[in-house]
Amino acid sequence: MRRIRIFDTTLRDGEQTPGVNLNIQEKVDIAKQLARLGVDVIEPGFPLTSPGDFEAVQRIAREVEGPYICGFSRAIIRDIDETWKAIKDAQKKCFHIFISSSDIQIKHQLGKTEKDVLEIVKSTVYHAKQYTDEVEYSPMDASRTRLEFLYEVIEAAIDNGATVINIPDTVGYATPIEFGELIQKIRKNVRNIDKAIISVHCHNDLGMAVANSIVAAMNGAQQIECTINGVGERAGNAALEEVVTHIAARKDYLGFETGIDLSQLYKTSKIVSRYMGIPIPVNKPIVGKNVFTHESGIHQDGVLKERSTYEVIDPRLVGRDDSVILLGKHSGRHALKVEAEKLGYDLDEERLNKLFNDFKKLTDVKKNVTTADLESLIIESAAKAVEEAYVLEKIRVVSGNIETPSAKVVIKDSKGNLLEAEQTGNGPVDAVFKAINSVIKETENLTLYKYSVSAVTEEMESLGEVSVTLREKEKLYTGIGTHTDIITSSAIAYIDAINKAIAANARAQKN
């Protein structure tokens, strides 16, 4: 059976989702989970975007084993040299070189000609090949590129060392039949295409990313590029969990398979959702809350008699296990560490100590702590992997329908000083945020960009998880807070986002 390689770009293309700004520890955690999932290639970021991105790619290259770690680079010699410094320590490494190839992008974005682009591709692919055996080349906007030029530039890339040719539908313009025919034409008209793997990278602007990816594979593509939960710019990318589950469910018809451990899908989806602060829609295929829920009486009757009557896959196949492990106030550090490892988190001593303290605080207000609660605490801990300039010490809120909501906060700064403030607002959360703003001077240039709330479990005493994104000019900072009291969660998340903004500005000044 033909094997399709899975190239994950959650940490590069996926992180370009508006409002997403992962810290280094979050990126490392996601990369390690992608390795457990079994992806063939991880594109961990764009190293030259910032010193933080460079460090994240470098750490992933050093710490993550199994998949290829792919360095994403513009078709510029000096960029390739610098990108190599970020990926060189990886067990398995490769390059991904890209440049626009469509008439509209060559003319209006690059200000060049097709001849210019052809020469750039030859020289940069050859240069990258001097560093590593595997080099991927992407003619960006391939689905809108003049076919004769597309064939020519692909041939030139392969002649100069490219081992993977990626065909991007950059703006999600193609339809499935059309995209499948494009792959066929490339296989037929590119003289040396047998010397390279054909990859596809589909965007979802017209809702066809997964369909285009599957049809491309049916027509000979050997690698599919995708992201967890379909995250990415604009309408996102092909959703990895949908692509690989479709291949697994219909391998009898499709005749190919992947190396993905499907049982890790749901866990990976949740980690990415929480770190990025993007809730999973309830009807999202494979990982949405309602996907295996049956409301119709006829459907319920059928599922009770035989699950396959209305479920095309067993939920357990993709890691949708409803079993719950309960921890309580008498649970020790070892039990906590074991459960964290079962969830896929390898915690060092510092992170374990922090988690244990947070866990003990939670058991004071919640009798039983579930695996979902524990995972939420771990994710919140990773989200706070920056030096905390401010920490919430106390909070008191007065609210109701007969008086103006007010909030009092006590915040400790990095020097141990306690800062107090009380404010009223248009609701308790607004009052809390105004109180925080009144004592933290660094909030002057920050504005609220996004606020979302979700319950970690469905119990009455469930942890409430809040994601707050703040904007400072063109930069976005996302904080996460969890607590059984949603107002407290909001305050924690708000201060977390502020701390990230402060840390980012400090790094920028240092550099």
From Swiss-Prot:
Residue ranges occupied by any Pyruvate carboxyltransferase domain in the UniProt entry: 4-266
Molecular function terms from GO: 2-isopropylmalate synthase activity; acetyl-CoA C-acetyltransferase activity; manganese ion binding
Primary localization class, coarse: cytoplasm
Amino-acid biosynthesis is among the record's keywords: yes
Stored Gene3D superfamilies: 1.10.238.260, 3.30.160.270, Aldolase class I (3.20.20.70)
Disulfide bonds: none
Keyword terms: Amino-acid biosynthesis, Branched-chain amino acid biosynthesis, Cytoplasm, Leucine biosynthesis, Manganese, Metal-binding, Transferase
Catalytic activity: 3-methyl-2-oxobutanoate + acetyl-CoA + H2O = (2S)-2-isopropylmalate + CoA + H(+)
GO cellular component, one term: cytoplasm
GO annotation terms (biological process): L-leucine biosynthetic process
Top-level EC class as recorded in UniProt: transferase
Key word RNA-binding present: no
Residues binding Mn(2+): D13, H201, H203, N237
InterPro entries associated with the record: 2-IPM_HCS-like (IPR050073), 2-isopropylmalate_synth_dimer (IPR013709), AIPM/Hcit_synth_CS (IPR002034), Aldolase_TIM (IPR013785), LeuA/HCS_post-cat (IPR054691), LeuA_allosteric_dom_sf (IPR036230), LeuA_bact_synth (IPR005671), PYR_CT (IPR000891)
Cofactors (names): Mn(2+)
Transmembrane parts of this sequence: none
Pfam families cross-referenced by the UniProt entry: HCS_D2, HMGL-like, LeuA_dimer
Annotated pathway: Amino-acid biosynthesis; L-leucine biosynthesis; L-leucine from 3-methyl-2-oxobutanoate: step 1/4
EC number, as in UniProt: 2.3.3.13
Region (Regulatory domain): 391-511
Protein localization: Cytoplasm
Purpose: Catalyzes the condensation of the acetyl group of acetyl-CoA with 3-methyl-2-oxobutanoate (2-ketoisovalerate) to form 3-carboxy-3-hydroxy-4-methylpentanoate (2-isopropylmalate).
Family: Belongs to the alpha-IPM synthase/homocitrate synthase family. LeuA type 1 subfamily.
Summary of subunit composition and partner proteins: Homodimer.
The name this protein goes by in its record: 2-isopropylmalate synthase
The organism of origin for this protein: Acetivibrio thermocellus (strain ATCC 27405 / DSM 1237 / JCM 9322 / NBRC 103400 / NCIMB 10682 / NRRL B-4536 / VPI 7372)
Organism lineage: Bacteria, Bacillati, Bacillota, Clostridia, Eubacteriales
